[in-house]
Structures are given as C-alpha cells and as structure tokens.
C-alpha cells in the first residue's frame, strides 16, 4: 500500500499554455503524508523558444548511500540537484560527467568504470562539478591501459585517498624511468596517504617497484601474479633491506589452490627472507600473508 512506501523518486517536465491548473495539482504534494516522510518537492517554470515548461522534481529523492551515473540516469536539466545521502558515486562514462548536474557533497568513494577515460583533459574540472575531490578517500579506476602519469595527475587533486583500486598499468609511450623522474611522481610520493592497493590485473615486479616508490606508506597490497614470478615478488617484498616496503604488513594474492600450495611450500622451505603466516580463503580464492 502507499502508506508502506519507502522510496519515491520523481522528475517530470510538463509543457503548458496556462500553468494555473498544474500549480494546483502540485499542491497535493504538500500534504501531511509527504511532510511526515520528509519528502519535499519543487516546481520550477521556465520558457524556451517554442513553449513554456514546468519542471517538477523531488528535492529529497532517496536515502540511498550509492548512486550510479549511467546512460539515462544523469541529471541533464539546467538546475543543480544536491543528493546529500550518497557516499559512493559510480560513473559509467565521460559523457555522464560532462552532462550531469547532480552534486554529491558527502561522497567519499568514487568509482570510475571501464569506459571512463582519465586521459580527458577536462575530467578534473568536470568531476569537481559533481563532488568535492579532496573529500574522496577510496578511489577505483577500472579502465584498461591506465597511464600512471594520468593516474598521478588525478591523485594530486585527491590528497586524502587511502585506498586505491585499479586493474592495469601501461607505460606505452612513457617509460618507467621517465615516469620516476617526473616532478609529479615526486610530488605524489611525498603527499599521498595511500595505505591500501588492490590491483586486479597481472602484477609484475616492475609494477610493484613503482607502487612502493609512488606510495611509500603502503601497508596492504592485493595482487595477482604469474606463478613463475611469485618467488621473485615475495623475495622483493619481504626483504628487510627494502626500505620502500618498510610499512608493508599484509599481502593478498588472488590465486587458486595450486598457487596457494606453491606459496605455502616456499614459505616452509625458508627460501624467503622472513618468517610468514598464511591463510587461504578458498571461497574467494585469496591467500593472505602477514609477518
């Protein structure tokens, strides 16, 4: 029944000649039923070249913590709508950033889906219209062939990110040494607060060297590694003389039972530079290593 209604979102545009009748209809939404539920609505009239319109929409549309800006859901009217309840914003592609007029003042988690290109020179300005970048604490970048320099540029506007998730890193056209010599690399390595990384792609030793130099405060890394590289990776990460890994305390390998067994054998054989403990999550295929 209507009295059990928990969520009510509405936005409609009405063309009219005489708006008197429309305004009278809208008054029905000022009744006690809506006020008790703290659902409020706004009606705005504006003119175009060919006709007059009324835009009627809910100003407190929902209490959801997450919102996905995808095709057909972005707010493309000329008025900004503020969504206070949302803490996690997911953006599907660059067009949704460019055309959207929603604003999420309390967002702390930002997910940029695979179709979002951070190479777009306008992406920072457009994101700032949607949410306060300095407030973001958890950032997910799911695009392929991610340029580390572009990622660093984006992170320079998000100094409070502590958890970073991404699934690729490409040095095509921009070598590892050039990246490390870039002033932006040195800046990010000094100011960032990132303590946790989740890397979904196959991780190489070169990737790890970059991660630990760029994010010197890392305490947790989740990665997937080719079987033949696992020993080299562990020896590098667990080496006590590796000052870049001095804060690292927990590793998570995305692996199957065979790889988990191989890593456990490595640890028991004492071929690694320090003693470790492990636990295998066979439900999620994750091996955790700590020391």
Predicted regions and their residues:
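Eukaryote-biased activation of long, low-complexity terminal tails and linkers
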Residues: 1-291
């Amino acid at each position: 029944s209507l009295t059990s209604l928990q969520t009510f979102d509405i936005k409609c545009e009405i063309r009219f000649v005489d708006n008197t009748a429309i305004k009278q209809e809208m008054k029905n939404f000022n009744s006690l039923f809506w006020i008790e539920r703290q659902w409020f609505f706004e009606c705005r009239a504006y003119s175009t070249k060919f006709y007059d319109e009324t835009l009627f929409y809910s100003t407190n549309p929902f209490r959801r913590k997450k919102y996905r800006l995808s095709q057909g859901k972005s707010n493309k009217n000329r008025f900004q709508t503020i969504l206070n309840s949302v803490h996690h914003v997911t953006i599907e592609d660059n067009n949704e950033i460019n055309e959207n007029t929603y604003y999420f003042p309390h967002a702390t988690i930002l997910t940029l889906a695979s179709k979002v290109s951070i190479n777009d020179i306008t992406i920072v300005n457009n994101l700032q219209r949607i949410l306060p970048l300095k407030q973001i604490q958890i950032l997910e970048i799911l695009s392929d062939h991610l340029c580390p320099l572009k990622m660093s540029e984006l992170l320079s506007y998000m100094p409070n990110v502590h958890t970073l998730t991404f699934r690729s890193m490409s040095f095509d056209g921009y070598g590892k040494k050039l990246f490390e010599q870039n002033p932006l690399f040195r800046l990010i390595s000094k100011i960032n607060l990132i303590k946790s990384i989740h890397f979904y792609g196959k991780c190489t030793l070169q990737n790890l060297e970059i991660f630990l130099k760029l994010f010197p405060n890392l305490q947790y890394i989740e990665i997937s590694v080719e079987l033949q590289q696992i020993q080299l990776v562990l020896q590098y990460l667990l080496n006590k003389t590796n000052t870049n890994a001095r804060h690292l305390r927990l590793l998570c390998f995305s692996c199957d039972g065979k790889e988990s067994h191989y890593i456990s054998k490595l640890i028991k054989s004492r071929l690694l530079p320090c003693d470790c403990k492990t636990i295998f999550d066979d439900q999620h295929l994750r091996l955790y290593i700590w020391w």
